[in-house]
Amino acid sequence: MTEQQCIALKRKAFQTYFSSLNEQQQKAVFSVNGPVLVLAGAGSGKTTAIISRIVNMIYFGDGYAKADGFLPEEDAVWLQDYIDGKAETDVERLREILAIAPIRPWNILAITFTNKAAGEMRARLASTLGEEIAASVNASTFHSACVRILRRSITLLGYDSDFAIYDADDARRLMKNCLSDVNVSEKQFPPRSVIQEISRAKDAMISPAEMLEDAGGDYRKMMIAKLYGVYQQHLRASNALDFDDIIYLTVELFRRFPEELAKYQYRFPYVLVDEYQDSNLVQETLIQCISGERFDRPNVFMVGDVKQSIYKFRLARPEFWKNTAHTRRRRARTRRSSFTRTFEAGITYWNRSMRFFTVS
C-alpha cells in the first residue's frame, strides 16, 4: 500500500466514523487548527457540527488533516473492514490508529448564548464522550464563563471575589437612588430607560467618561452619562455587578492585566462559539482577547446565521460576517464551500487566514 493510499484509507475511516454528517459538516469538523467561520442556515445541523467537532478534537486531534502514510498491514485490514461495515466501531482502536495530537477536553472553551443551549451541549457531549470527559469541557454561556473568571481575579479591579450580581429589579432600585443623588425626577429619566442606555453603553464598551465626552452639550445625554457614573460608583461600593458588568469587566480585566489574559489564552487554546451572529462588541472583544491577540492563527471556530440574529436590541452585530472590526487587518482569497458549489471569494478574515464554510 502506497503512502497516498494509507492517507486516503485513514481519511475514509474518519468519514465513516462521522458518516451521520454531510460533506460540509465534515469539512467543518475536520478543520481543527486555525480560525474557521461557518455560515449555517436554520436546521442545517450547526449544533451537531459543533458537538462532532469537539468529539473529533478530543478523540483524534488533527488526525484528518495530518494523516500520514504509515499504516501496519493489520491496521489497514481492520480499517478497511470497518469502512465496509464488516467490523464494529471500536473507538479506542480508531484513536490508536488515527489520532494525532488529541486535544485535552479542559483546553476547549465552547460558548453559546443561553443556559438551555449550554445544557444541551453538555448533555450531547456526555452521551458520546461519557460524563467524566464531557464534564472537563468548558461548555457555558458568555456570562457563566466570565463569572468564573471574575471570581478568581476580580480583586485586581478592586472588588471582592464574593461580589453580588444584581438582577433587573435590583438595578432599577439602585437607579432610583442614583436619580435622587443627582436630584432629577423619575418622570424625566425613567429608571428602566436609563438602565437600558447604560446597558447599551456597556455592550458597546463605552465608559461613563467616554459617554460624557460624546454627549457634547446635549443635556439629556450629559445626565445619562452622569447617572451612569453614579450608578457604577454605587455598584462598586456595594461590591456588586449588574448583568452587563460581567462581560464588560472581564474584558477590562484582560486589557489592564495582560498576565491574567495570558493564563486563559494558554488554558483555552481552542475556542468555539455558537450563534455568533448574536454577539455584540464586548462579546466579540472577549473572544478576540482569549483566542486572537497573541497568536498568528488562533484556533477559533465560529458558527452562525446572519438571518437568525435575535439580539439586535442588545447591539448584536450580525454584519460581523461581512466586515467586523477585529477582522479588518488583512484580506485574502479563501475557500468557501456550499452544498451545491465550491468557489473562490474574497473574505475578510480573523488575522492571517480564515477557512470559511457555508452550510445550507
Give a label for each model feature.
Residues D169-L235:
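Coupling/switch/interface segments within P-loop NTPase motor domains and analogous charged loops
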Residues E186-Q196, P208, E213, A332-S360:
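Coupling/hinge elements of helicase-like and P-loop NTPase modules
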Residues P105-Q196, E319-N323, N351:
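Conserved P-loop NTPase-based nucleic-acid remodeling module centered on helicase motor cores
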Residues N56-K66, I103, G130-E131:
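Post-Walker A helix-loop "phosphate-sensing" segment adjacent to the P-loop in P-loop NTPases
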